[in-house]
Regions:
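Vicinal oxygen chelate
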Residues: 1-49, 79-96, 102-130
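Surface-exposed interaction/gating patches
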Residues: 32-76
Length: 130
């Protein structure tokens, strides 16, 4: 999807034939044939959430919910799109601004002990326990 069609992040929806997309390490040809050998889960296990700031979070969350065919809920007064393995939270932004502003990463307890929150280049990163 082009960011103008689905604002907030670059979204790509693909599938690979002859594989179960629900498997954590399902085939993904663009990554090459030996990508699984490069996986290291000592600290990071996966992305489980993102936060998108939008001028109209209610409207944008409805669009994302429709496009992703996923449930739209409200948590802590913020609209959220709930997918099979992650949650997309929409928050209020300044006028004319739409962007990814946070990610939530499932991490090992060892990583979490190093610190739960960091900010990098304006992006809030939160590490949560396994």
């Amino acid at each position: 999807f082009h960011p103008k069609d689905l604002p907030g992040a670059l979204v790509e929806i693909d599938s690979v034939t002859n594989t179960n997309y629900k498997e954590k390490y399902a085939d993904w040809p663009p990554a090459g044939s030996d990508w699984r050998a490069q996986v290291n889960e000592d600290y990071v296990l996966g992305i489980v959430g993102v936060t998108i700031a939008a001028e109209n979070p209610d409207k944008l969350s409805k669009l994302w919910s429709d496009v992703l065919d996923s449930k739209l809920t409200v948590e802590n007064n913020y609209p959220c799109v709930v997918t099979e393995n992650a949650k997309i939270t929409f928050v209020q932004a300044e006028i004319g601004y739409v962007d990814l502003v946070g990610i939530k990463i499932k991490a090992s307890n060892e990583r979490v002990k190093l610190g739960r929150n960091i900010k990098m280049l304006g992006l809030d990163i939160e590490f949560i326990s396994e």
